[in-house]
């Protein structure tokens, strides 16, 4: 990568705006450091009052207590801050910041700030802090007289212009007038700092011995430099650079004497350090130099333009965008921009050719056109050659500068670098500090956008997703200076943050999005990370259109954003949910645990309830001797509902036989074998043994000989499962008690779960009460909450006992058979004869209707059957019955269609009314 190092302080600036006018007027060759502190605030007084504060009653100027201020100034000098100023680092002071406010521009007078006079022997540089304000009345008369000379000199050369009338104006005419006035005052009031770097063709001795000659002329009378001599590089680039003011080696004296044209070159034309005390430098926002020896890119190399990578083109684009933003916002940074632009045009060689002229006046083209700069930048050539350094012209070797290398700014491509794009305000101020954020904030989105990058709705980042389709042209530009609303999108004044307004949604567009197919995501191509910043290095460099096919109907559809902020309602892209299945209400109450030996010691049991839709843990159940439980549940269930109750840490008693008594050879006295005792021990035992003691030891030996059973408490776990399909008919509309086995945890899958079945691996039985209520068209808050409450409400439902019997003819397959039929409530029982064999049972579910006989064949009518009945069962079976008289058929229809359930009078519960209607 080619790098060229350059200095912005090598260019000569005489193009000053209104701010530069005041700076040049207040700069004097023989001035001391600026006072660190002043009393009062200049922003609170008018220009006339500020002028009065600088003078005594007799008209003498007052500059404050210099002895006290010199102490503070010397403290700053001890910090060795001269090198910072010599390298061009400015400092924003209070007077500079206050000039940019609208109410202070007109009130600020050019005579409101004066610098302390400094002797020529001290040679101090201006201090780092400068604050405008009122002065006290204890200053010396010398400072006031020299300050008055400045005003007198200005009024002498500009009799028609009043210095107090000069104010900051944005108009072009006032700016040009300020430039013309500043050209003389700048040359008249050069500070000692500006003599540290001289013109390449002016002798240093002549400059130091004849300081009056430096103020004899003005900048517009400068002579051009011959093309055969190269300009001298800045002093800070030389190998012999030191800290402090630097003076370039003077040229041979005969160079100036042989060429009389060069005698007209003034001292003010020297390459000064481009520093003014009241105009701090604003560094150009460029990316730092990085090692990019291994190029990387997320776009094809064929799409990269060399002109976009070159230093000269990139610099001009940056300057053009800075100029456009500062002019549009009304700021007064035009002079600083022109200085840098003129230097970039003068200091660097282009196309291998040396400049034959060094223009030191940038006021000739003080208002460059932005379009001209951009067009010229596209015509630059030979800037991307793989040359890391270029040698300095030979003319510099005679001056003792050695080999100096010009470094260039980074050459990596902005669109392919792994950077985080920042948000910039209208003034171009940078709000982040990543590698290329400075340039990305200055350049617009068109300079950095690639077809693979698109602003995603609903995010706070302009580039936060990797789009699968080509971005819409209407959404590429989000920059706007004013807040506006377009189709539900509110753009903030920062120009890059867009928030979606759901109130502006159009129903037609929502329906279209709902019916469209969602954009398919390729898991290998698109990262699903939760972060907003996508790493450009991980993305493939080939074209996306050749990687996969876009689904049909999604060409003009926006991609689904990967975001967790919730600004975008993703339900628009989802399919409509299907209608839910009819759900009933299932109530369960746990009663107790049976057939299990639970320890009498109070020990807690953990119970976990697991359903297809949820998983809950009950509080610890304190188990007593009766093993009772007390828990209620209510579930929304379908026919395939299943619930499991897992019991953990059940304490049970494990009774096992202990070790039998000791053998007969054991000594009765102490329980040890006799042969293990020593002779001395036997002697003393026999000596001190008593009869009473022998009896006690013998009784203890008998007790120890008996086998004792030890009780061990262990904890086991098991699971009890209940299926609704097994108990639905029994608990439909009424409470039903059931026992289900608790199967050991290790044998849960080996043993089938059946009601009242106890296997070898079961721990016990769980007793519970259940109740099922079908789905009713009532709100959920109207339904009972517990099984006990539902049972109390069902007591108000009265069941009507329906009964009828007789002979009817039934169509079975292809024949008609005479059967004896018995009706009990809503159930039909068929027998071969009265008191004969039972054949079938039929449960009525709907209203029974009559069938006209014209629908049947002649064979049926020939049997003497005059009426027919059609009935439907619960399982949707149909049965056809016939009678030999219309009177018998009418009686059966009346009984079958009678209500079997009725509600007691005075009952107003809505769910009971719906339940009775459902059962009827």
UniProtKB/Swiss-Prot annotation:
Phosphoserine: modified positions: 15, 24, 46, 62, 95, 531
Substitution effect: residue 718 to D: Disrupts the structural integrity of the C2 membrane-binding domain and impairs the function
Main location group: nucleus
Record-level Gene Ontology MF annotations: cytoskeletal protein-membrane anchor activity; lipid binding; molecular condensate scaffold activity; phosphatidylinositol-4,5-bisphosphate binding; polo box domain specific binding; protein-membrane adaptor activity
Region named Disordered: 1-452, 538-561
SUPFAM superfamilies given in the database record: PH domain-like
PTM annotation (Phosphothreonine): residues: 34
Bias (Polar residues): 461-481, 542-561
GO biological process: actomyosin contractile ring assembly; mitotic actomyosin contractile ring assembly; mitotic cytokinesis; mitotic cytokinesis, division site positioning; septin ring organization
InterPro entries: PH-like_dom_sf, PH_domain
Extent of motif Nuclear export sequence (NES) 2: 763-773
Sequence ranges assigned to domain PH in this UniProt record: 802-901
Motif (Nuclear localization sequence (NLS)): 681-710
Residue span of region Cryptic lipid-binding C2 domain: 551-920
Motif Nuclear export sequence (NES) 1 location, chain numbering: 69-81
Modifications after synthesis and translation: Phosphorylated. At the onset of mitosis, becomes hyperphosphorylated, leaves the nucleus, and forms a medial ring. Phosphorylation by plo1 and other kinases may contribute to solubilizing mid1 for export from the nucleus. Phosphorylation by sid2 drives removal from the cortex at the actomyosin contractile ring constriction onset.
Domain note: The N-terminal part (residues 1 to 452) is intrinsically disordered but moderately compact and is able to demixe into liquid droplets at concentrations far below its concentration in cytokinesis organizing centers (also called nodes); these physical properties are appropriate for scaffolding other proteins in nodes. The N-terminus has the ability to associate faintly with the medial cortex and is sufficient to form tight rings. This domain is responsible for oligomerization that may contribute to the activity of mid1 as a scaffold for other proteins in cytokinetic nodes and contractile rings. The C-terminus contains a cryptic lipid-binding C2 domain and a PH domain, and is involved in the anchorage to membranes, which stabilizes cytokinetic ring position.
Subunit (UniProt): Homodimer. Interacts with blt1 and cdr2. Interacts with gef2. Interacts with plo1 and rng2. Interacts with fhk2 and sep1. Interacts with clp1.
Task performed by this protein: Scaffold protein that anchors the contractile ring (CR) at the cell equator during cytokinesis. At the onset of mitosis, membrane-bound oligomers of mid1 assemble recruitment platforms for cytokinetic ring components at the medial cortex and stabilize the ring position during its compaction. Recruits dephosphorylated myo2, but also rng2, clp1 and cdc15 to nodes and to place cytokinetic nodes around the cell equator the medial cortex to promote the ring assembly in cooperation with F-actin. Necessary to stabilize the mitotic spindle perpendicular to the axis of cell division.
Protein name according to UniProt: Anillin-related medial ring protein mid1
Organism name: Schizosaccharomyces pombe (strain 972 / ATCC 24843)
Gene this chain is encoded by: mid1
